[in-house]
């Protein structure tokens, strides 16, 4: 990238901060709250443009606010309190996100993913499903879906899951039937398989709390704004009917709307069998990994009254180290995990400050006045639809969640009649499901889009069709099922 095009990415967040800070102070807001919001908005712009990695953007924002805390973070009344030391208080705020249980849950889930990858268990599971179900193209679509479904609960990076585990396997399948990329033969079987790869990644990202990092970011934002939260089991149970429906419906729907020319064949099962033979029998490390994952899932679903989900993850990671499934170097060298750890903790810190300075409360009251007179159900559905469609304007799920989720939560808090747990779960599901809309919405999207099997027109058309179906089903289950199990 040329320096001339690089500098605007650095200057744009600073310009946004300056413009907002110089605007007239809105009625009902204190000056420090407005200045805090200016810096927060600048951070969001930085996350979208990424002049530097997202974690660095967030850390710079926190540093600015902490250093200038007498003017950005604390009110004159707080500063006037006897014994109030803004230096200690600002430091305490700056690192508060790193003690959030959500951060440690997602870090543990990353280590689970490392265990899957290092032992080869994730690849083995996918190959077994392909071998057993690959004789018919439709069943091969279900094999892709089930592979994603099994890996999703313990792989919080949908990019690692979709682009790092599933894609390297399924990209080998079309050439077995002479279905080549960027060629008329791509529709033979390759286009269907690749579309199933990305759509399965989006669906499974919405099914489990730990299937996608922005899901956990949303819960952190929800907790910082309201002290309410959703457990792993709450999320799973609330999504259960929609999850079952989508897992069973999507492969068939893709088969109907984007039909492969080739309907059956034996080449894929034979290839998968060859790969499994090369891997050898299930080894002891894979068995230990499988046992720990089953135990973690059971505790996440049923153990919420006895042990926190983050503590389950923390303990399982300790056992993985003791059982030599992973080693300490695997933890300290996991760049993806530490990257998410820092940006997620930093964003939760920033969201907490947005609430502490009173901005969320002020914005909620502002919305309450404009939304009064409308049915809470209509407002909730309208907010979900707007949130969902705004995905077209974001190329990062993290930036999308960071920018819009606090506003969505504030809007829900403005109307006490809106059930916050239900609304937040619908928002969370929309993050994953809405990732299907564009070829840039989430990490694996460009990988599948660039495979040569999904022409631009087809991707946008299918994204709109599947996106609309997902949205309708989400609203229906959100109104009929989720209140029954979450309230």
Swiss-Prot record:
The chain crosses the membrane at residues 10-30, 33-53, 54-74, 93-113, 137-157, 189-209, 236-256, 292-312, 313-333, 340-360, 370-390, 393-413, 418-438, 462-482. The keyword Endoplasmic reticulum does not apply. One of its GO terms (cellular component) is plasma membrane. It is a multi-pass membrane protein. GO terms for molecular function: antiporter activity. It catalyses: (2R,3R)-tartrate(out) + succinate(in) = (2R,3R)-tartrate(in) + succinate(out). Keywords: Antiport, Cell inner membrane, Cell membrane, Membrane, Transmembrane, Transmembrane helix, Transport. It comes from the Bacteria. It is found in: Cell inner membrane. It holds the Pfam family Na_sulph_symp. Belongs to the SLC13A/DASS transporter (TC 2.A.47) family. DIT1 subfamily. Catalyzes the uptake of tartrate in exchange for intracellular succinate. Essential for anaerobic L-tartrate fermentation. This is L-tartrate/succinate antiporter. It comes from Escherichia coli O6:H1 (strain CFT073 / ATCC 700928 / UPEC). The gene is ttdT.
């Amino acid at each position: 990238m040329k320096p001339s095009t690089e500098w605007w990415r650095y200057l744009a967040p600073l310009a946004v901060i300056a413009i907002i800070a110089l605007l007239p102070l809105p009625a009902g807001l204190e000056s420090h709250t407005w200045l805090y919001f200016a810096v927060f908005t600048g951070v969001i712009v930085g996350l979208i443009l990424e002049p530097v990695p997202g974690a660095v953007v967030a850390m710079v924002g926190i540093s600015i606010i902490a250093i200038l805390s007498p003017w950005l973070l604390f009110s004159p009344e707080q500063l006037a309190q006897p014994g109030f030391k803004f230096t200690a208080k600002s430091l305490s705020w700056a690192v508060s996100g790193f003690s959030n249980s959500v951060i440690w849950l997602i870090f543990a889930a990353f280590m689970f993913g490392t265990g899957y990858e290092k032992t080869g268990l994730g690849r083995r599971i996918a190959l077994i499903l392909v071998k057993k179900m690959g004789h018919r193209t439709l069943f091969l679509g279900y094999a892709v879906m089930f592979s994603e479904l099994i890996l999703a609960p313990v792989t919080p990076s949908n990019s690692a899951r979709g682009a790092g585990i599933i894609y390297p396997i399924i990209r080998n399948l079309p050439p077995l039937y002479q279905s080549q990329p960027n060629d008329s033969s791509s529709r033979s079987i390759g286009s269907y398989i690749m579309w199933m790869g990305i759509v399965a990644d989006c669906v499974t990202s919405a099914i489990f709390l730990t299937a996608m990092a922005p899901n956990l970011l949303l819960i952190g934002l929800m907790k910082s704004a309201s002290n309410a939260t959703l457990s792993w089991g709450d999320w799973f149970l609330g999504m259960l009917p929609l999850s079952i429906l989508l897992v069973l419906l999507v492969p068939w729907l893709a088969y109907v709307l984007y039909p492969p020319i080739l309907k059956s064949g034996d080449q894929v099962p034979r290839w998968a069998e060859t790969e499994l033979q090369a891997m050898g029998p299930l080894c002891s490390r894979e068995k230990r990994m499988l046992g720990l994952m089953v135990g973690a899932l059971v505790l996440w679903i049923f153990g919420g009254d006895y042990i926190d989900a983050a503590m389950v993850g923390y303990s399982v990671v300790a056992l993985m180290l003791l059982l030599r499934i992973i080693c300490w170097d695997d933890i300290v060298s996991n760049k993806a995990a530490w990257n998410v750890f820092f940006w997620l903790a930093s964003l939760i810190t920033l969201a907490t400050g947005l609430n502490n300075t009173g901005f969320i409360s002020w914005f909620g009251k502002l919305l309450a006045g404009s939304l009064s007179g409308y049915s809470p159900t209509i407002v909730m559905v309208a907010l979900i639809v707007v949130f969902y469609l705004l995905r077209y304007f974001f190329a990062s799920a993290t930036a999308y969640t960071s920018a819009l989720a606090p506003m969505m939560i504030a809007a829900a808090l403005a109307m006490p009649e809106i059930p916050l747990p239900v609304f937040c779960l619908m928002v969370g599901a929309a993050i994953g499901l809405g990732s299907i809309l564009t070829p840039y919405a989430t990490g694996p999207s460009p990988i599948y889009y660039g495979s040569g099997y999904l022409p631009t027109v087809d991707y946008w058309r299918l994204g709109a069709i599947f996106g609309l179906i997902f949205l309708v089903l989400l609203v229906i289950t959100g109104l009929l099922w989720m209140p029954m199990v979450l309230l």
